[in-house]
Amino acid sequence: MALREIVTEGYESLSKICKPVTSFDSRLELLVKDMKDTLVKADGLGLAAPQIGVLKRLAIIIDGETEEMVALINPEITAMSGVQNKTEGCLSVPGVWGKTERPAVVTVKAQNEKGEWFEMTRDGITAVCICHELDHLDGILFREHVVEYIEDRD
């Protein structure tokens, strides 16, 4: 298990647009495994490559329907509907929580570790997580979606 350091707000990779993944090889498989291990250790719902200083279009989410970790490589939201308000935090912005407005349902098209395309439609917190992690790939932090900060989460 190789844990990666999660970088925090102010780190350069968090404000950059990531490059597409073009090589689906053992190095990518290792990166995905490291990100999954790091996500488990951090006890989060998702992790994007720029959060570990890697400028690739790759995110890991925990799918609320299956409870499995899913790699979203070169992801693109193809449809969204409705609106939901949720409380969000971010592993790269520790200790900060805010109410955000996100789509209620999203459909994302992405590649898996083998380069095969797939599509998934999710709602609830998984939809929020998909939007949150894909924002990271474009240099956007969740603060840009906060409508109200929460002082005490307990």
Regions found by a protein language model. Give the residues of each.
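Positively charged
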Residues: M1-D154
